[in-house]
């Protein structure tokens, strides 16, 4: 009986099969190759890397602008005519696309690490192009329609850059294992120099990046100013329907500094609270009076307005994803809210909070078009509300307002020079948080001008503004910000310097050690395993060298792995005698030479 010993045994290599299979659909051993990656596939790798960076930026953008999700929804509502929570599906889609691209990039880097030829599958290429094109189009659209929001990205980096730097240093340190492997395998000195110079240029640029980082929270703790005062934006709109008595009462329960309200004049001259031009979003006007749904809210009389429900929309659309957290009693109360008049707000807030009042101009055909400011002033003055607790925002007829109500805090909603503000007797500024810098805050403070910033909902943004010395902010999320005891982080400059210098030194030491280790492991390797010989006909050696190496491997395995004594005892009269009684040669007599050739060809297959 003849027992055959296989000339070569291959381990399953499941991890390698999964690596090449998922990336390029090359699940079989014979489909893999150690050849150099083609220029075309290198171009796809560069495109993959670029797409990774772009989708990472896009994902970071949508994660950080959650402070302004409501603003984005409001913008699209005005464009499309219906309310929906658009940022959530955008964020989920972006996260899924980023995860897919990141997975492909990890697989590509693993190909480089193990010396496998990259061959991205055509389905992945289609997905890559689709994601890249979609991201570019989306970013361009946001840049045109919501261009101010890109400034939020720069502001957020003031809070995250110190920690992103440490994370980037750690990532580059881990990536150095692959770069060092390429450096060690490179046979040409010019290639090694190029790899070394390029990599360490990037590394040292990253090490010195903290010199360009500026954050208001890098400061001594003793220099931290008081916590910014909180003004409820339309009350507490995350806990109750905006501009309702319930919303303002919830805000007062938090002991806020002030309340912000938008005032509209009804057709019969009653000031009431409404932000939108129409009633469609925040009332049930489409159910009660469909013919009035698109009419301006100020073109309805107060009797009609009182018949509308101003709370059901909050429970139905759940604009801040907070309706489910309401208690049963709050849920019932919210469901039965009606439109709030200015007189009701003044009575509720009297002696309890400062009011930041903004007036919305009525249409030209409105009977109170020319006198709506006087009507509003009379309502405030007749209520007995303290004048010094009113921040008056409208710029129209400001001299008249100062004459009639000299105690009002005149507030400007536009950014102007200090001299112009002083001439207009402006005491406060009400600006978007992206409109003012730290230096401008200090300049305004030196002229005794207080600055209020809107709309601040995210704790990270509130912390940054706290460190920057902002006196007050307007917020939808006042119930959460009122519970923030201190900035999310604050670090003395010396400690921050020590942190990034230590991170850089540790990283540099590890990188040098990795390069030395990889050079020691891979620098002198010039041998080949059977798989390399079979699947790669031109790796470092000429085809003649590969043929010679095949023969050496085959005969070395014959001498080491074949049980010669058993074969001789069982098959003494066949062609195996040639191998047992003569030296192995690539080409021999009839018996041995032909069989050797057969074995070589079998091995080659």
Curated annotation (Swiss-Prot):
Key words of the record: Cell projection, Cytoplasm, Disulfide bond, Glycoprotein, Hydrolase, Lipid metabolism, Membrane, Neurogenesis, Transmembrane, Transmembrane helix
Disulphide bonds in the chain: 15-18, 25-571
Keyword Glycosyltransferase: no
Principal EC category: hydrolase
Catalytic activity: a 1,2-diacyl-sn-glycero-3-phospho-(1D-myo-inositol-4,5-bisphosphate) + H2O = 1D-myo-inositol 1,4,5-trisphosphate + a 1,2-diacyl-sn-glycerol + H(+); sn-glycerol 3-phosphocholine + H2O = sn-glycerol 3-phosphate + choline + H(+)
Post-translational modification summary for this protein: Intramolecular disulfide bond between Cys-25 and Cys-571 is reduced by PRDX1.
Transmembrane segments: 43-63, 90-110, 126-146, 161-181, 193-213, 497-517
Residues modified by glycosylation: 301, 336, 352, 374, 448
GP-PDE domain: residues covered: 228-485
Alphabetical GO biological process terms: lipid metabolic process; nervous system development; positive regulation of neuron differentiation
Compartments where found: Endomembrane system; Cytoplasm, Perinuclear region; Cell projection, Growth cone
CDD domains: GDPD_GDE2
Topology term for the membrane: Multi-pass membrane protein
GO molecular function: glycerophosphocholine phosphodiesterase activity; glycerophosphodiester phosphodiesterase activity; phosphatidylinositol-4,5-bisphosphate phospholipase C activity
Residue intervals annotated with topology Cytoplasmic: 1-42, 111-125, 182-192, 518-605
InterPro entries: GP_PDE_dom, PLC-like_Pdiesterase_TIM-brl
Primary localisation category: membrane
Protein function: Glycerophosphodiester phosphodiesterase that promotes neurite formation and drives spinal motor neuron differentiation. Mediates the cleavage of glycosylphosphatidylinositol (GPI) anchor of target proteins: removes the GPI-anchor of RECK, leading to release RECK from the plasma membrane. May contribute to the osmotic regulation of cellular glycerophosphocholine.
Similarity-based family: Belongs to the glycerophosphoryl diester phosphodiesterase family.
Subunit structure comment from the entry: Interacts with PRDX1; forms a mixed-disulfide with PRDX1, leading to disrupt intramolecular disulfide bond between Cys-25 and Cys-571.
Protein name: Glycerophosphodiester phosphodiesterase domain-containing protein 5
Gene source species: Homo sapiens
């Amino acid at each position: 009986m003849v027992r055959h010993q296989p000339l070569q045994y291959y381990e399953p290599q499941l991890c390698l099969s999964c690596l090449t299979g998922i990336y390029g659909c090359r699940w079989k051993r014979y489909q893999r190759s150690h050849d150099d990656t083609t220029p075309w596939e290198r171009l796809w790798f560069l495109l993959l890397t670029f797409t990774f960076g772009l989708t990472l930026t896009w994902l970071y953008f949508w994660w950080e602008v959650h402070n302004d999700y409501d603003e984005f929804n409001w913008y699209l509502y005005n464009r499309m005519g219906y309310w929906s929570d658009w940022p959530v599906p955008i964020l989920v889609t972006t996260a899924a696309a980023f995860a897919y691209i990141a997975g492909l990039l990890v697989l590509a880097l693993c190909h480089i690490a193990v010396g496998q030829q990259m061959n991205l599958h055509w389905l992945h290429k289609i997905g890559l192009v689709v994601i890249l094109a979609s991201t570019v189009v989306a970013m361009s659209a946001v840049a045109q329609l919501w261009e101010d929001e890109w400034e939020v990205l720069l502001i957020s980096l003031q809070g995250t850059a110190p920690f992103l730097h440490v994370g980037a240093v750690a990532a580059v340190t881990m990536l150095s294992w692959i770069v060092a492997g390429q450096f060690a395998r490179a046979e040409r000195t010019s290639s090694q120099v190029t790899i070394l110079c390029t990599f360490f240029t990037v590394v040292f640029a990253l090490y010195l990046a903290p010199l360009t980082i500026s954050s208001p929270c890098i400061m001594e703790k003793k220099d931290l100013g008081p916590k910014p005062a909180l003004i409820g934006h339309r009350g507490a709109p995350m806990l109750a329907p905006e501009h309702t008595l319930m919303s303002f009462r919830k805000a007062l329960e938090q002991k806020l500094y002030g309340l912000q309200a938008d005032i509209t004049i009804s057709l019969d001259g009653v000031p009431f609270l409404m932000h939108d031009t129409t009633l469609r979003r925040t009332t049930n006007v489409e159910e009660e009076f469909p013919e009035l749904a698109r009419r301006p809210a100020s073109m309805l009389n107060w009797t009609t307005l009182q018949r509308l429900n101003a709370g059901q929309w909050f429970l139905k659309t759940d604009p801040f994803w907070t309706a489910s957290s309401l208690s049963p009693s709050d849920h019932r109360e919210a469901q039965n809210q009606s439109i709030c008049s200015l007189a009701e707000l003044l009575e509720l807030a009297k002696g309890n909070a400062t009011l930041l009042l903004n007036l919305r101009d009525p249409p030209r055909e409105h009977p109170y078009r020319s006198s709506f400011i006087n009507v509003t002033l009379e309502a405030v003055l007749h209520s007995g509300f303290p004048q010094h607790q009113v921040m008056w925002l409208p710029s129209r007829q400001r001299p008249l307002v100062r004459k009639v109500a000299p105690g009002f805090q005149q507030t400007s909603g536009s950014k102007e020079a200090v001299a112009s503000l002083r001439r207009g007797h402006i005491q406060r500024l009400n600006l978007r948080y992206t409109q003012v810098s730290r230096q401008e805050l200090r300049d305004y403070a030196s002229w005794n001008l207080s600055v209020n910033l809107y709309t601040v909902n995210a704790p990270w943004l509130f912390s940054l503004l706290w460190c920057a010395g902002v006196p007050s902010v307007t917020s939808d999320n006042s119930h959460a910000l009122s519970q923030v005891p201190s900035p999310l982080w604050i670090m003395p400059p010396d400690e921050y310097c020590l942190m990034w210098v230590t991170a850089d030194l540790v990283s540099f030491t590890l990188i040098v050690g990795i390069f030395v280790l990889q050079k020691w492991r891979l620098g002198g390797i010039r041998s080949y395993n059977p798989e390399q010989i079979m699947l790669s006909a031109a790796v470092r050696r000429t085809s003649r060298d590969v043929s010679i190496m095949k023969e050496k491997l085959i005969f070395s395995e014959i001498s080491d792995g074949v049980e010669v004594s058993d074969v001789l005892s069982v098959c003494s009269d066949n062609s195996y005698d040639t191998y047992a009684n003569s030296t192995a040669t690539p080409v021999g007599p009839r018996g041995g030479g032909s069989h050797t050739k057969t074995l070589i060809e079998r091995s080659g297959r």
